[in-house]
């Protein structure tokens, strides 16, 4: 049962726009959230995903502010987080309102051929907006995803890998350091600030039970520090989006006004009134989006976009360079040998202009612009690990196959066979997979693989060449899900132990 502190009711009554009803607000807070997902276009198109899941009893209603976001209804109970398509990164379970900030950041001049090359996500975990921005960037450029909580960094990293993101570097800092360490370094910054979470009451009925105005005031002080740091880290001409999942103006409009008062000659608010059809319903006088739960039947949310019109003085001097960077550029001869191995074993290629680095006996693929950031601060994780060096040759890493084998070809529009045991090589969903070093799996086989089990080649009903072929990829719905060793009678599973799922479905 929903529990709201009476003090919150009194507080929010003073802030609710006159054209909105308090009764409707309370009713909206009592309704369960509509289930929503975002299709991961790094791995599959929205059209193919809809065609794939519709025969499974899914129906889709588009989220108006995200071309790849959908409210979904299912004809049967299904644990979305445990279904194959989620595990392989075809979609992200994401509340519709939280899709707004990346959409706002990548609009107008920020979405064309001059799209931001260097982007900062200052408070990233668990990764919904990070992976959304990576998809909007099509894995190009550099996306630095920062998270202050050590435990949440692990979740962020897992989601980045699951979704096939390769242009990301992870950091673990208090976001307030970025104004000092990365002064005017980014083309775009997203600050989805830590907040009071007043807008989340529809999924957490206790979110407002202990609400106190003093807590709002305290966290607003932190938000002011963070938005100043975000602005300092932004290049002149760049865009800053500030967002929260809370409703109080103290944490929203007041924070943006604080930045304007701090830098009146360098901050320009950009109106989001035309961000999508119907955006004006939530638009404030300043051009911010203050999303109340009853407007779009969603979580409460706040989004503001600002442009940095001029450089501002840095507050502290340039920090000393970080020493002992453990990576070095790989020699061209070794890169060529690695590329030959990847091509011959998996029929995959490194992206054009790939920045390949070495650490001990490990090859890593770095985002192209990352070299400018070497020595500026400590990074938890950079790009993707490609392969280990063996005595004879290489051993590809799982995350490399997921990223490089993101789209091997699908024909989901012709997928009329939903039998999980149907042989993969005769399933029309896999007919367009022409990669000779990839074995398409059906649902039952994919489940076996993700549970860490070897696959008996007899399950292919004679449709698979039983000649041992060594390392190969396996795919499901046209996207790689891992590596096997083709031994003839069985496909030996190479899934990392930490990714093995004991139960599926």
From Swiss-Prot:
Biased composition (Low complexity): 410-435
PROSITE patterns (UniProt xref): SAM_MT_RSMB_NOP
SUPFAM superfamilies assigned to the protein according to its UniProt record, in alphabetical order: S-adenosyl-L-methionine-dependent methyltransferases
InterPro entries in the record: Methyltr_RsmF_N (IPR031341), MeTrfase_RsmB-F_NOP2_cat (IPR049560), MeTrfase_RsmB-F_NOP2_dom (IPR001678), Nol1_Nop2_Fmu_2 (IPR027391), Nop2p (IPR011023), RCMT (IPR023267), rRNA_ssu_MeTfrase_F (IPR023545), SAM-dependent_MTases_sf (IPR029063)
Chain residues that bind S-adenosyl-L-methionine: 123-129, 147, 174, 192
Compartments, record wording: Cytoplasm
Assigned EC number: 2.1.1.178
Active site as annotated: 245
Main location: cytoplasm
GO biological process: rRNA base methylation
NCBIfam families the record matches: nop2p, PRK11933.1
Family classification: Belongs to the class I-like SAM-binding methyltransferase superfamily. RsmB/NOP family.
Function statement: Specifically methylates the cytosine at position 1407 (m5C1407) of 16S rRNA.
Protein name: Ribosomal RNA small subunit methyltransferase F
């Amino acid at each position: 049962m929903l529990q709201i502190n009476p003090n919150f009711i009194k507080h929010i009554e003073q802030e609710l726009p006159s054209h909105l009803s308090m009764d409707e607000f309370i009713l909206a807070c009592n309704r369960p959230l509509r289930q929503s997902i975002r299709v991961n276009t790094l791995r599959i198109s929205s059209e193919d995903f809809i065609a794939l899941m519709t025969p499974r009893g899914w129906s889709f209603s588009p989220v108006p502010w995200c071309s790849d976001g959908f409210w979904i209804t299912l004809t049967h109970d299904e644990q979305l987080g445990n279904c194959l398509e989620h595990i392989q990164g075809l979609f992200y379970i994401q509340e519709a309102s939280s899709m707004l900030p990346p959409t706002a950041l990548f609009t107008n001049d920020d979405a064309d051929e001059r799209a931001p090359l260097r982007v900062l996500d200052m408070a990233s975990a668990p990764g919904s907006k990070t992976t959304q921005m990576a998809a909007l960037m099509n894995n190009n450029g550099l996306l630095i995803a920062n998270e202050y909580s050590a435990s949440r960094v692990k979740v962020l990293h897992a989601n980045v890998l699951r979704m096939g993101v390769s242009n990301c570097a992870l950091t673990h800092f208090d976001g307030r350091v970025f104004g000092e360490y990365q002064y005017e370094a980014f083309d775009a910054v997203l600050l989805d600030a830590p907040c009071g979470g007043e807008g989340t009451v529809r999924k957490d009925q206790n979110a407002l039970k202990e609400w106190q105005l003093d807590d709002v005031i305290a966290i607003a002080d932190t938000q002011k520090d963070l938005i100043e740091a975000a602005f300092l880290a932004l290049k002149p001409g760049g865009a800053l989006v500030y967002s929260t999942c809370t409703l109080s103006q103290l944490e929203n409009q007041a924070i943006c006004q604080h930045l304007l008062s701090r830098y009146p000659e360098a901050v320009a608010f950009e109106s989001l009134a035309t961000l999508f059809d119907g955006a004006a319903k939530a638009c404030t006088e300043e051009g911010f989006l203050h999303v109340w739960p009853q407007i779009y039947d969603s979580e409460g949310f706040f989004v503001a976009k600002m442009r940095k019109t001029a450089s501002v003085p840095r507050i502290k001097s340039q920090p000393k360079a970080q020493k002992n960077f453990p990576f070095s550029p790989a020699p061209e001869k070794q890169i060529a040998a690695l590329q030959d191995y990847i091509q011959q074993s998996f029929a995959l290629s490194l992206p054009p202009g790939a920045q390949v680095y070495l650490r001990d006996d490990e090859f890593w693929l770095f985002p192209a612009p990352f070299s400018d950031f070497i020595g500026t601060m400590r990074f938890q994780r950079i790009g993707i690990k490609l392969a280990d060096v063996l005595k004879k040759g290489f051993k590809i890493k799982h995350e490399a196959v997921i990223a490089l084998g993101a789209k091997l070809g699908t024909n989901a529009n012709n997928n009329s066979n939903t039998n999980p045991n149907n042989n993969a090589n005769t399933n029309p969903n896999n007919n367009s997979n022409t990669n000779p070093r990839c074995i398409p799996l059906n649902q039952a086989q994919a489940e076996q693989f993700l549970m860490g089990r070897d696959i008996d080649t007899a399950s292919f009903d004679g449709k698979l060449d039983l000649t041992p072929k060594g390392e190969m990829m396996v795919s499901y719905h046209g996207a790689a899900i891992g590596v096997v060793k083709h031994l003839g009678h069985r496909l030996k599973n190479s899934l990392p132990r930490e990714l093995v799922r004991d139960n599926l479905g």
